UniProtKB/Swiss-Prot annotation:
This is 3-isopropylmalate dehydrogenase. It comes from Prochlorococcus marinus (strain NATL2A). PROSITE patterns: IDH_IMDH. Pfam families: Iso_dh (PF00180). It is found in: Cytoplasm. Its EC number is 1.1.1.85. Binds 1 Mg(2+) or Mn(2+) ion per subunit.
Length: 359
């Protein structure tokens, strides 16, 4: 029997709740398809601050490195906001990405037919949306040096540096074009080349990569226009390629096309090593412990893990289809209750319904 080692990082807020549901579902799926998943839960984010004093302990890093994949729920809580930046949960996430060289963030956004009414946009605008945001994840302004805050005679001055090298742009562009080749063969590169030198390099390198993919249509949009187009005509996009900061913002805009950020999975990948699979949403501490969180983004992240990291494509498709069936049956968590339905369920009940479908 094939066996896989998965590191679980439940993190903070609703993280443990959606992790518990996903763990149980993956156990069912693995048994049904004849493989084994060995899970190891490790502290990360706020939970690691509580246990180890830092958001990303070395023991967690080593466990991640020795895994076939990492399944992360969510991190962050306002109670850690007064800590020095290097000790906050968010810094642990940045360190995870850099330590595993997770340079490629893949965020699919696809409208589930039964949820078209959940979107804040009209049905006709969103019903054909099927796009992927490919975001560079380990460079750009979040990692650039110098950065900091200094005292001046005019008060405090704060600064960050946005930087990219040709190699960094090249490798993320390759990911986007290869992905587009499997889809509708369109890449839209998003930058701010009319203002930023770093974006001019981004555009030049993307064009160079595109020369190797003659069958792929490459277009360019400035980030402000891309944000508008995502709301105005989202179905025009296939693969959106962009940098760290712009991708962070655009992927959250794209997330709301589905009606809830609780629906969207993501994968953060490297060329050689374990990937990290996580929902796009945050830790939602305001609803933690109430059993009302939407576990679907976490479950779809698990499906991405099955497909990409473990090559268990049949199992991944089976899980995705079961999730769609539950939604088609009218079951909704509270974040989706703008749709007319009487079948509101909580996090654990959504997991139980899905488990019944999988048997």
């Amino acid at each position: 029997m094939k066996s896989y080692k998965i590191t679980l990082l439940p993190g903070d807020g609703i993280g443990p709740e959606i992790t518990n549901v996903t763990h149980k579902i993956l156990d069912l799926v693995s048994r049904k398809f004849g493989f084994e998943i060995k899970f190891k839960e490790m502290p990360f984010g706020g939970s690691a601050i509580d246990s180890d004093g830092i958001p990303f302990p070395d023991r967690t890093l080593q466990e991640c490195k020795n895994s076939d994949a990492v399944l992360l729920a969510a991190i962050g809580d306002p109670k850690y906001d007064e800590l020095p930046r290097e000790k906050r949960p968010e810094t642990g996430l940045l360190n995870l990405r850099s330590s595993l060289d997770l340079f490629a963030n893949i965020r699919p956004v696809k409208i589930i037919p039964s949820l078209t009414k959940a979107s804040s946009l009209k049905e006709d605008f969103v019903k054909e949306v099927d796009l992927v945001v490919v975001r560079e994840l380990t460079s750009g302004i979040y990692f650039g040096e110098p950065k900091g805050r200094i005292k001046t005679d005019k008060g405090e001055r704060a600064f960050n540096t946005m930087t990219y090298t040709s190699e960094e742009v090249n490798r993320i562009a390759e990911i986007a074009f290869k992905l587009a080749k499997q889809r509708n063969q369109k890449v839209c590169s998003v930058d701010k080349a009319n203002v930023l030198d770093v974006s001019q390099l981004w555009r030049e390198e993307t064009i160079l990569v595109s020369n190797k993919y003659k069958d792929i249509e490459l277009t360019h949009q400035y980030v402000d226009n891309a944000a508008m187009q995502l709301v105005r005509n989202p179905s025009q996009f296939d693969v959106i390629l962009t940098g760290n900061l712009f991708g962070d913002i655009l992927s959250d805009i794209a997330a709301m096309l589905t009606g809830s950020i609780g629906m969207l999975p993501s994968a953060s990948l490297t060329t050689d090593g374990p990937g990290v699979f996580e929902p796009v949403h945050g830790s939602a501490p305001d609803i933690a412990g109430k059993d009302i969180a939407n576990p679907i983004a976490m479950l779809l992240s698990a499906a991405m893990m099955l497909k990409i990291a473990l090559n268990e494509t049949e199992a991944a498709t089976f899980l995705e289809n079961a999730i769609n069936e539950i939604l088609n049956d009218g079951y909704r968590t509270s974040d989706l209750m703008s749709i007319q339905t009487t079948k509101q369920v909580g996090c654990s009940q959504m997991g139980e319904l899905l488990a019944e479908k999988l048997k």
